[in-house]
Swiss-Prot record:
Protein's job: Participates in the reverse transport of cholesterol from tissues to the liver for excretion by promoting cholesterol efflux from tissues and by acting as a cofactor for the lecithin cholesterol acyltransferase (LCAT). As part of the SPAP complex, activates spermatozoa motility.
GO terms for cellular component: chylomicron; endocytic vesicle; extracellular vesicle; low-density lipoprotein particle; spherical high-density lipoprotein particle; very-low-density lipoprotein particle
Signal peptide, first to last residue: 1-18
GO biological process, any: positive regulation of cholesterol efflux
Stated family: Belongs to the apolipoprotein A1/A4/E family.
MF terms in GO: amyloid-beta binding; apolipoprotein A-I receptor binding; chemorepellent activity; cholesterol binding; cholesterol transfer activity; enzyme binding; heat shock protein binding; high-density lipoprotein particle binding
Protein name: Apolipoprotein A-I
Superkingdom of source: Eukaryota
Residues modified to Methionine sulfoxide: 110
Post-translational modification note: Glycosylated.
Sequence repeats: 68-89, 90-111, 112-122, 123-144, 145-166, 167-188, 189-210, 211-232, 233-243, 244-267
Quaternary organization: Homodimer. Interacts with APOA1BP and CLU. Component of a sperm activating protein complex (SPAP), consisting of APOA1, an immunoglobulin heavy chain, an immunoglobulin light chain and albumin. Interacts with NDRG1. Interacts with SCGB3A2. Interacts with NAXE and YJEFN3.
Record organism: Cebus imitator
Subcellular location: Secreted
Length: 267
């Protein structure tokens, strides 16, 4: 229970910097590294799920009848996309490094604000943890007689046990909801304070002069433009790699349609 409450605190205050237990000895990731890892996981999941759908279609009766060899084309497409990712790796890394460098001061200020707000809300989180542990203990005490009855065979039907448990479960749910609502109310001012601090930081940047904002905009545009220019060769390679795949799919599809038309005409 304590771990669950601490997890809630970490999620609320630090943006979920928790790692898997086998990664605890690794150096902490930067926010940009986490964003890049998340994007990679998303792309890989889409790629894997897409291949599963293609495989399921080819295994179906219609897929076997058409014989489009979609899985071979999908694997070729995947290889081409993977090559694109490898080619763009250094370019995107440079973009992330530049962006992280330009926004470093703002992240440092916000980290300080987060630590201050975290210190203020910690007593409320500790109080919530204490009350929740008390509720669990109380619920366990109320369940003990029912557990004893059930073990001794006094309750012959599971329905009887469910009828006795339902009021207790509803009571615990209502009390838990009340504690969560109280915690939400207590934390609301600090959430507003954090948003206000961020707005203040941005306002300071704005009031520091139009030249500063224009400079950041120009740098961002420059980085994006450089990313686009450096990505052109890799994108052209992707286009060239896709052409044989698309042509193969086109030929297979037209051949399948022609074969299907012949079967219809012969019937």
């Amino acid at each position: 229970m304590k771990a669950a409450v601490l997890t809630l605190a970490v999620l609320f205050l630090t943006g979920s910097q928790a790692r898997h237990f086998w990664q605890q000895d690794e150096p902490p990731q930067s926010p940009w590294d986490r964003v890049k890892d998340l994007a990679t996981v998303y792309v890989d999941s889409v790629k894997d799920s897409g291949r599963d759908y293609v495989s399921q279609f080819e295994s179906s009766a219609l897929g076997k009848q058409l014989n489009l060899k979609l899985l071979d084309n999908w694997d070729s497409l995947t290889s081409t996309v993977n090559k694109l990712r490898e080619d763009l790796g250094p370019v995107t890394q440079e973009f992330w490094d530049n962006l992280e460098k330009e926004t470093g001061w703002l992240r440092q200020e916000m980290s300080k604000d987060l630590e201050e707000v975290k210190a203020k809300v910690q007593p409320y989180l500790d109080d919530f943890q204490k009350k929740w542990q008390e509720e669990v203990k109380l619920y366990s005490q109320k369940l003990e007689p029912l557990r004893t009855e059930f073990q001794e065979g006094a309750l012959q039907k599971l329905q009887d046990l469910q009828e006795k448990l339902s009021p207790l479960a509803e009571q615990v749910r209502d009390r838990a909801r009340a504690h969560v609502d109280t915690l939400r109310t207590q934390l609301a001012p600090y959430s507003d304070e954090l948003r206000q601090r961020l707005a203040t930081r941005l306002e300071v940047l704005k009031e520091s002069g139009g030249a500063s904002l224009a400079e950041y905009h120009a740098k961002a545009s420059e980085h994006l433009s450089a990313l686009g220019e450096k990505a052109k060769p890799a994108l052209e390679d992707l286009r060239q790699g896709l052409l044989p795949v698309l042509e193969s799919f086109k030929v297979s599809f037209l051949s399948a349609l022609e074969e299907y038309a012949k079967k219809l005409s012969s019937q």
